[in-house]
């Protein structure tokens, strides 16, 4: 038998701190105006001409990053990040912190449940879930550091030796040359651009297919921008060119349009979920929406704790779980799941031709794909360090 001193009390959390950061980091939309991610890309609001030319014009990049540190009674610190800036920091300091301080390190399920239920009346999605995500990720990071284990070991251990990636960005030809297994293009034109815009979307995809060949996965990210008739026609026009999946064609709550599109999509897959929240929301997406691939963002959906349930639900429906972006936070989860066959790398270099860390300059030692693959380290927690020089703490818990 192992000798265990039952009199040793587990470590407790003594403080929660929330910070904001400007310029990249967790909010990767917070970029210069020349960045491809802020350019002419279809969005729900691009039906209005004044908000069509740039995603910055309607404020996609206004929130900024939020960073949470949780400190144990012996001074060990874990941290997590999300999008949310000042509003999320205020919620964390003034509401969520009461459910964290005093808890034992490792009480992640109870803490998450209390944070979620205490914010239902004004939360459930959006910025509140982002705030909960940052806290939850900090708790998992701390638990790994206290136990001397990477988070993926806390989740059951890896099911593969390394992660394989596809790349999101406007240059799938470059992605192929860098060793990625696929590329996901941003859809440029939405319904407001008419039949000419649709034809241009098809032309862009066809040209990309000609450059990368047939042995390369090619997808379209529609970012909630389409209506059902447009999506049906786009899907039909693209079938000759090997569209692997069509992503997030509709707003998250329109499960019925997802279901209607899924009925005619095969062999193309339907993917969605980066803007979905809660296991109940994903149940609707799987039951009514009939999606083949769900894409929760670990830094937006509530953190690692709800991801465990969402992934189990997806497995019951025979669906893949390929989280949206989320870098190292997604990597530690994906490597433990049989139904997560590969991962997304979001190309955040301005012209989408260079491989750089997604959350730069906020994280240090952030792994990036080499020849389209990543082998995770054995460092405890999420295995990255925080660049504290960038942090500003605008509020303190009351």
Curated annotation (Swiss-Prot):
Q: How is the cofactor bound?
A: Binds 1 Mg(2+) ion per subunit.
What EC designation does it have? 4.2.1.90
Q: Name one GO biological process term.
A: amino acid catabolic process
Q: Where is this site: Increases basicity of active site His?
A: 297
First and last residue of the signal peptide = none
UniProt: Mg(2+) binding residues: 221, 247, 274
- Protein name per Swiss-Prot or TrEMBL: Putative L-rhamnonate dehydratase
UniProt keyword Lyase, yes or no: yes
- Annotated active site residues, numbered on this chain, are 324 (proton acceptor)
Species whose genome carries this gene: Caldivirga maquilingensis (strain ATCC 700844 / DSM 13496 / JCM 10307 / IC-167)
Q: Kind of enzyme, top EC level?
A: lyase
Q: Where is this site: Transition state stabilizer?
A: 344
Miscellaneous section: Reaction proceeds via a syn dehydration.
Q: Which cofactor does it need?
A: Mg(2+)
